[in-house]
């Protein structure tokens, strides 16, 4: 079984080919970071237009890289949601058109399902069941994963996602887009003892998150600061607060569920300090921590191809309807 995967949920155009026996054969990725940088964030209309320009050339690149013809494919998987509706429609429309032209089945994949399965692309993939921390620009949630399509959300952000809070705070600090990596780099020079930010919702039961208050705290603190070192100290305090909050909630979830494996996926999962702290804290509970390869932490076609492959293997299939959902609850992604 060989699957073509297409990802266009936001500002990355990703295409990949995966084979059930040989694994990932190729992946091609185009990032729109440079396009959106001058606006300080993603402009949905520009994102959709750029997907239109780049998607078919990337499909050809991925097929050529995998030495694969259309006749070699078993099916096509595409991101059906959640995400920017216009961007999703580009990927869904192309995927359905190719499937119809080539006589192949197609299946829509939940974007966050792709992320939580991405660690299976690594050299040491975790076994089901596992606990997943999905932490990105659009989502922050803890999920009990029993198998493909068997997901139970244990907690999620009630306002800003962690990645969104990183980007917004980076903008307050005058850093370039995307802000998360830039803020982490600035925080390396910061004094961890200078400022102390709260760890939201860690003083009460439950596994939900809230990060909007940290952004406000950063703004208030910045009004009283002037120097480059001040900015670095604020960045460090912010990063420490976000990382501590994520670690505390993950540790609580491991203890409450008895999970032996924690999967961390999404762009914020590439944060070095978060990885270090989780390894120490979760490891002390006797659980292992698993990540996707670094290149698959952010949005990509490989994770969509893998999720599609696993759903096709389980007998999934859809009609010819082009489905795109700006919002889509992960728990509603039915078991296959």
UniProtKB/Swiss-Prot annotation:
Substrate binds at residues 134-138, 167, 180, 271. Its EC number is 2.3.1.234. Binds 1 Fe(2+) ion per subunit. It catalyses: L-threonylcarbamoyladenylate + adenosine(37) in tRNA = N(6)-L-threonylcarbamoyladenosine(37) in tRNA + AMP + H(+). GO terms for molecular function: iron ion binding; N(6)-L-threonylcarbamoyladenine synthase activity. Keywords: Acyltransferase, Cytoplasm, Iron, Metal-binding, Transferase, tRNA processing. Its main location: cytoplasm. GO terms for cellular component: cytoplasm. GO terms for biological process: tRNA threonylcarbamoyladenosine modification. Its cofactor is Fe(2+). Transmembrane segments: none annotated. Fe cation binds at residues 111, 115, 299. It is found in: Cytoplasm. Gene3D superfamilies: 3.30.420.40. HAMAP family: TsaD (MF_01445). Required for the formation of a threonylcarbamoyl group on adenosine at position 37 (t(6)A37) in tRNAs that read codons beginning with adenine. Is involved in the transfer of the threonylcarbamoyl moiety of threonylcarbamoyl-AMP (TC-AMP) to the N6 group of A37, together with TsaE and TsaB. TsaD likely plays a direct catalytic role in this reaction. NCBIfam families: gcp_kae1, T6A_TsaD_YgjD. Belongs to the KAE1 / TsaD family. This is tRNA N6-adenosine threonylcarbamoyltransferase. It comes from Thioalkalivibrio sulfidiphilus (strain HL-EbGR7). The gene is tsaD.
